[in-house]
Amino acid sequence: MKEDKTNILKKCPICSFIFVLIIIVFSMYFTSALKTVPCEKDMISVLYSNFIHTDFYHLLANLFGIYSLTNVEMRLGSKKFLTLILFLIFFTTLLEILLNKIIKTPCSIGFSGILYGVFTFEIISKDKYVDYKILGSIILNIMFSKITNNKSSLYGHVIGVISGVFGALIYKKIQMLKSKN
């Protein structure tokens, strides 16, 4: 039986909401309703910058990434997935602010750091072992994106991966504690 793809809004409300939100924010920049990209390193600016895409191809790549997360949302369920997304957004924001205090980091915009966080979380939390080939592929993808696009945020992507590792380790620990009870 063929799977009904039209029901994705009901099956994946978190991915759907993020997808629409990012399109709305992009449209606000495209129409000049919003004029400046928040590149300050305070909590609100860094948090907000996750939802900004000023380039159409960057927007499309991140929207495709969000679409690919629907499998993760269906596997975890929307409540756990929302918890993961919120954890990654806030953890990456804090890491970026802390890193900027040590070394001055360039402005990073877009949802790709969060995407890398979810992909890394998925690799580490899904099985009892870590798939180093896929993890290596994420690292190579980050390096390739920086080489091919000078504006690509190496720091934002790496911080996303680190956040995904922490999220997965915390998740596995919680699952282990639950299984003991």
Report each predicted region and the residues it spans.
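A detector for small-residue-rich transmembrane helices and their helix-helix packing motifs
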Residues: 1-181
